[in-house]
Design a protein with these regions (language model features):
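Non-catalytic DNA-recognition/assembly elements of restriction-modification systems
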Residues: 1-22, 179-185, 190
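A short beta-sheet element
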Residues: 36, 61-117
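Hydrophobic stripe of amphipathic alpha-helices that form coiled-coil interfaces
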Residues: 168, 172-175, 179, 183-193, ...
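Short, structured motif recognition centered on aromatic/hydrophobic residues
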Residues: 7, 12, 32, 65, ...
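Sequence-specific dsDNA recognition surfaces
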Residues: 13-24, 38-67
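A short glycine-rich beta-alpha junction/loop motif
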Residues: 91-98, 130-151
């Protein structure tokens, strides 16, 4: 059982650094997948089809993704949507995405991913968004979001539990919408319970 005194609240700006993506024209073929905001679905997953590509030139090598890199859409209807990159192929992230880098001795990427799907993240993000008709959640706004950070072993336990529910939700056939909805509600319930750490006075 995690003791509340072991949970620290930090702003994302205190524990992370954020990098905007590479600006280029997407192509139908190339040496790396070009991941755009339209490639992240409503559940924070990478859409497997409709891929676009670019050729990896020297100036875009620093935008190549590694496994467990986190990406967030910063503009448009999908602002705030966060995905975790878990593919084995080369990929570069586009300009309307922000890459989030956290010290892995403080924050496990998958723990953050689950947090970014939840109510606590969205309550804050929706207050920080700007831009009216074209919503923007830029890096400066993102830095202000507060996150509860339990010790790493507790983060690992939370991730293990939530991953099981997430896997169940996404492994069910598309032909069972009622079952999918029930699983999604179950995942959302446990996510909110497991991430509900009262703030220190």
């Amino acid at each position: 059982q995690c003791r509340l005194k072991d949970v620290v609240w930090k702003t994302l700006g205190e524990v992370g650094k954020f990098t905007y993506g590479y600006i280029a024209k997407a192509q139908d073929a190339g040496t790396a997948r070009f991941i755009r905001i339209s490639d992240i679905n409503a559940n924070g997953k990478l859409i497997p089809n409709g891929e676009k590509y670019i050729d990896v030139l020297p100036e875009c090598k620093k935008y190549l993704l590694k496994k467990n890199d986190l990406l967030m859409a910063r503009t448009g209807a999908t602002y705030g949507k966060t995905m975790i990159f878990s593919e084995d192929y080369p990929a570069v992230y586009a300009g309307f995405l922000i890459k989030l880098d956290f010290d892995k001795n403080i924050l496990i990427p998958k723990y953050y991913w689950h947090f970014a799907q939840g109510e606590l993240f969205w309550r804050q993000a929706n207050k920080l968004v700007s831009g009216g008709g074209q919503p923007q959640l830029n890096a400066n706004a993102l830095k202000m979001i507060k996150i509860p950070i339990p010790p790493l072993p507790e983060q690992e336990k939370i991730v293990a539990i939530l991953d099981k529910f997430d896997t169940l939700t996404n492994s069910i056939s598309e032909g069972l919408p009622h079952e999918i909805a029930l699983r999604r509600k179950q995942y959302e319930y446990y996510r909110e319970q497991l991430l509900a750490f009262p703030k220190a006075a």
